[in-house]
Amino acid sequence: MTKKNLPLNFLLDKILKRLIQVTIALLATLLIFVGSFPSLAAETTTIPLTEEQWQQGEEMAQKAIEASQKGDFPQAEAYWTQLIDEFPTNPALWSNRGNVRVSQNKLDEAIADYNQAIKLAPDHPDPYLNRGTALEGKGMYQEAIADYNQVLAINPEDAMAYNNRGNAQAGEGNWQQALQDYQKATELAPNFAFASANAALTLYQLGESERALQKIRNLVRKYPLFPDMRAALTAILWTKGQQGEAESNWVAAVGMDYRYQDLDWVRNIRRWPPAMVAALDNFLKLKL
């Protein structure tokens, strides 16, 4: 998972680029290592602010972002709440608070925040993307797909929405549709590494193990510090009897991210496809 927060100068009617916060805790909560991304940006009419109000708001928004980057999500939530109390008609603030609530697994409260952001900015794609992520966290995949469809109706070239919809399709067991979405995401954003990773894992689930292996090898070469693909390469190589190479990739994978030793995390948080989970399980059982 990653999230995107907008600075407070959203209040000045600027359409701002999505700002991705990358933290390990946030990615894990969002299921996807790039599985499901939220964000927000839209035009709005606001009451003119004094220079002092603008400065105070900017400072508090920056504190909220810094708190999130440090993993202090309760403090970040408190900052966004203060800003909402001051500027309740700003949809970005509601969406940003929803993001940090997702990070604390407060999914229902996050969805309520995204609902308010959508009410205030119904024609902007980002709050739908955010809400889709939270819905995925609750296992409400069809509802998440509907939100991602709305994003794509507004912006047909949103690579994150395709990746996220692929995750939701995978949650429903629609592996072919998931693959198509992941591939579209990588077509739109060739350097979207996690979408490429999701496509590779899905190929394995669909029985195309050689294509999956080739794609995973390519990703490991391009991104040698990518533990997800190191762990996947370990699992596939082990099933092919290439124990030595499997072991060396495993040492690298767990050295970067120990969570791959936890099948429950791999299955339910990272959400690898069942065939990949089974391959890793086979490796771990024999290893232990």
State what each model feature region is.
Residues 58-69, 81, 92-103, 112-115, ...:
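Conserved alpha-helical positions within TPR/SEL1-like repeat arrays
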Residues 43-52, 245-288:
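Terminal, low-structured helical/coil segments at or just beyond the last alpha-helical repeat
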Residues 86, 120, 154, 188, ...:
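Structural marker of alpha-solenoid helical repeat scaffolds
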Residues 24, 28-87, 288:
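N-terminal leader/linker segments that initiate helical-solenoid repeat arrays
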Residues 217, 221, 227, 231-261:
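TPR/TPR-like (Sel1-like) alpha-helical repeat modules
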